[in-house]
Structure formats: structure tokens, C-alpha cells
């Protein structure tokens, strides 16, 4: 009897030791998993929280578009967007640079409580590439200098682009491509005496152009309405309806004559 009791006690002790061993292994495995998860998770979280550069000049990246503009040079005067960003910028490069190119690069520049892009007098900005300039409740562009738009999608809930000619300076704009959407597409800055010279050579325009912009010239483009456009048309162009989308295209007018032609035989006179 004693022998059986001893064997039973030994089995209980063995089972207890085995259970403790299994439990200890489980505890160790649990904390190992937690440790590994933390090692993998927290660096990823830290990486995700780190601010990323939004613009590039040459081979150098910057945390803001404005900072990138300030680091342009005669050799590298193109600022390329690297991601969507919310920032209102002013074209103020270093003193030796009089103009820059903003390459949208498929990204969006969203206004931040002010006009999205301001071009001061005696500065030049060229906008290229696909992407967006979003004014929101502010204009997309205020220009007192020179502006060239060669691509992009521009939107605003108010006047989209504003220009100015004052006693000492005059804006100059040339738009050859892009999509432009706003209640009012073009207007004057508050202190402007005149619009300044602006020419539209191409692009798609959804919105109104007001009357009285005496130095606006329309040479091309597609417009959602013909209202007020006729006085701005360049010589020898007209508005042609596009039946597919309800737009009106500016095209060169063909010259034709209603007078019959008369063929003269050799030696004959009229």
C-alpha cells in the first residue's frame, strides 16, 4: 500500500513539474511575442509619424514648398512637389533669382487661409505638370508679376486668378494649358488700376469671365459659357460650339467669299 501511495505521489509531482514547465514555456513565449511585436510595431509607428519632405530642388528635399523656393538658384530654379501639401506660398526666391518653375508632379497644393500662390511684382512663375492648385475659399493665384501656366488643375470657390496693373508695375500672364474651375475665373486685385496683360491660348475653363477686363485677349481654349467673351476675342477667331460636352471652343475663322469665280479664256478681257 505504501508503495502505491509513493508512486501516486511521484506521479502527481511529475505532473505538477510538467504543468509548471508548460506554463513557464507559455509565459516565456507570450512575452517573447509581445517583445517582438513591440520591436516591429513601434519603429513602424515612429516612421509613420515622422514628417516627410514635400518639395525638392535639384537633389535636395525640403519640408515646405516655401523653404524650397528660398533655396532655388540660377542653376536649379525648379521646385518639384513630392506629395500633397497644404500651404500658401509666395514666390520669393533668393535675390539673384528672378523666376522659378513649379512642377506640380501629380500632387496638390492646397491653400492655407490665404491665396494659394502669390507672385509679387518683378517675379516670374511658370507652372507645369499635372496636379492641382486648390484655393478653396481663397483665390488660387494672385499675380503682380509674370505668370506662365502650362498645365495643372486650378479650382476656387471665389475668384480663381487675380491680376494687377498699378502705376509702377503690371502683371503679365500667358496660359496655354490646364483646367480652370471657379465661379469667376479672372479678376483684378483690389488696388489694381487695370488688369495687366493676360492672354489665354489654351486650356479648359469652367466659370464666368467678367466684362471690363480691357487687356485680356482670348486666342484659344474651351469655355463653358460665351457670356462676355466676344470683346476679348483676338482677331480672326470665333467661338465654335462643341456638341459633345456643351463647351465652346475658340478657333480660327475660315475666310470664304460668296462671289462667283470667272474663268477667262486666253487673250480675252473683261
List the model feature ranges, each with a label.
Residues 1-21:
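N-terminal secretory signal peptides that target proteins for export/translocation
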Residues 91-103, 118-134, 142-157, 163-183, ...:
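Surface-exposed loop/turn motifs in large extracellular/passenger domains
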